């Protein structure tokens, strides 16, 4: 982000996708026009399924370092301590993710699910467990979980600048 600041000072308009980013940019560039534009997403109504299911879900692109870090943390400190089925689903899970989950029969890694399968996992999960270690704006997986899931548990960085705090 800081690498782009040298160029951003010449912009006529800077658009931020989180209120945190907009506030930061307004301080960095007080003479620039900074606008907050909420994230676009495909959800237009709540589609959460009624009832209960028997698993906790983490989903994301698992080859991304930030997501790998989140999964490794959840596996070691949360999922390993539970008795409930925990599903880690997403594209291209790393070797580290697979190895971390392997000793625990109740933790399942679902690699490269189809869109239909991922939608089913999201809709049917009892709990969505989403954490991040970077406050890099609104996460689409958070929006998808809130629109399509039953319950969502997140850490404070997942909500940073999103305005969604009351929903989690």
Language-model segment annotations:
Residues 12, 123-137, 148-151:
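Acidic donor-binding loop of glycosyltransferase active sites
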Residues 1-14:
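Membrane-proximal helix-turn-helix segments that form the acceptor-binding/catalytic region
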Residues 20-22, 93-94, 152, 158-159:
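Alpha-helix capping/helix-boundary segments
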Residues 27, 35-123:
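Conserved catalytic-core segment of nucleotide-activated headgroup transferases in glycan assembly
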Residues 156-168:
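Short acidic/histidine- and often glycine-rich active-site loop of Leloir-type glycosyltransferases
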């Amino acid at each position: 982000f800081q690498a782009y600041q040298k160029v951003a000072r010449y912009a006529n308009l800077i658009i931020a996708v989180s209120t945190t980013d907009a506030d930061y940019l307004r301080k960095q560039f007080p003479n620039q026009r900074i606008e907050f534009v909420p994230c676009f997403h495909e959800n237009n109504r709540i589609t959460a399924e009624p009832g209960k299911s028997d698993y906790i879900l983490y989903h994301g692109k698992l080859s991304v370092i930030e997501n790998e870090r989140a999964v490794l943390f959840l596996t070691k400190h949360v999922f390993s301590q539970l008795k409930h089925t925990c599903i880690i689903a997403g594209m291209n899970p790393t070797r580290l993710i697979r190895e971390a989950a392997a000793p625990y029969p109740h933790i399942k890694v679902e690699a490269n699910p189809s869109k239909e399968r991922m939608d089913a996992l999201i809709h049917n999960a009892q709990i969505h467990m989403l954490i991040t270690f970077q406050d890099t704006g609104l996460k689409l997986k958070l929006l998808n979980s809130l629109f399509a899931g039953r319950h969502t548990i997140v850490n404070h960085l997942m909500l940073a600048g999103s305005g969604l705090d009351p929903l989690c």
